[in-house]
């Protein structure tokens, strides 16, 4: 699993006729699923995202998590995180899990993050063309890959 975590002052996602989903201060998490991902990878990533200490404490040091500050999370699926541009100029996406595998795993990841946060977590619409807007704070942007399991 691969995620891009962005510390935000606000973020939103919209798609077609759907009402936009908005969050205040917290994390925008773009999430990609690989074919080999499993419950262990989801659990590891869930704990990592929720407990990342990337918010400032009273001394101005990154020492608080999104949960610590009572922040919000917006999860957005993004299979393009597994793009391959090593050959030619058009990206290939064979490194991403297919819809039938990835959708239930993304839904499980969403459920796990909600349980870890102990409150609702916003999300976009899996497999839909979306418009994502954010006000990045810092900016703080991290790319995180789950450990390879064998």
From Swiss-Prot:
It catalyses: glycyl-tRNA(Ala) + H2O = tRNA(Ala) + glycine + H(+); a D-aminoacyl-tRNA + H2O = a tRNA + a D-alpha-amino acid + H(+). The keyword Hydrolase applies. GO terms for molecular function: D-tyrosyl-tRNA(Tyr) deacylase activity; Gly-tRNA(Ala) deacylase activity; Ser(Gly)-tRNA(Ala) hydrolase activity; tRNA binding. A motif (Gly-cisPro motif, important for rejection of L-amino acids) lies at residues 138-139. One of its GO terms (cellular component) is cytoplasm. Its main location: cytoplasm. It is found in: Cytoplasm. Pfam families: Tyr_Deacylase. Disulfide bonds: none annotated. Its EC number is 3.1.1.96. InterPro entries: Daa-tRNA_deacyls_DTD (IPR003732), DTD-like_sf (IPR023509). Keywords: Cytoplasm, Hydrolase, RNA-binding, tRNA-binding. Gene3D superfamilies: D-tyrosyl-tRNA(Tyr) deacylase. It comes from the Bacteria. It is an enzyme of class 3 (hydrolase). Belongs to the DTD family. A Gly-cisPro motif from one monomer fits into the active site of the other monomer to allow specific chiral rejection of L-amino acids. An aminoacyl-tRNA editing enzyme that deacylates mischarged D-aminoacyl-tRNAs. Also deacylates mischarged glycyl-tRNA(Ala), protecting cells against glycine mischarging by AlaRS. Acts via tRNA-based rather than protein-based catalysis; rejects L-amino acids rather than detecting D-amino acids in the active site. By recycling D-aminoacyl-tRNA to D-amino acids and free tRNA molecules, this enzyme counteracts the toxicity associated with the formation of D-aminoacyl-tRNA entities in vivo and helps enforce protein L-homochirality. This is D-aminoacyl-tRNA deacylase. It comes from Chlorobium phaeobacteroides (strain DSM 266 / SMG 266 / 2430). The gene is dtd.
């Amino acid at each position: 699993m691969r995620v891009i975590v962005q510390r935000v002052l606000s973020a939103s996602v919209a798609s077609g006729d759907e009402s936009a989903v908005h969050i205040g201060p917290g994390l925008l998490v773009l999430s990609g699923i690989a074919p080999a991902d499993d419950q262990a990878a989801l659990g590891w990533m869930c704990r990592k995202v929720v407990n990342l200490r990337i918010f400032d404490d009273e001394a101005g040091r990154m020492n608080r998590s999104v949960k610590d500050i009572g922040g919000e999370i917006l999860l957005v699926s993004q299979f393009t995180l597994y793009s391959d541009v090593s050959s030619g100029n058009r990206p290939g996406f064979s490194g991403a899990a297919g819809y039938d595998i990835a959708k239930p795993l993304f839904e499980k990841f969403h459920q796990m993050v909600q349980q870890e946060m102990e409150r609702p977590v916003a999300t976009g619409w899996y497999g839909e063309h979306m418009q994502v807007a954010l006000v990045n704070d810092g900016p703080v942007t991290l790319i995180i890959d789950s450990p390879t399991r064998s």
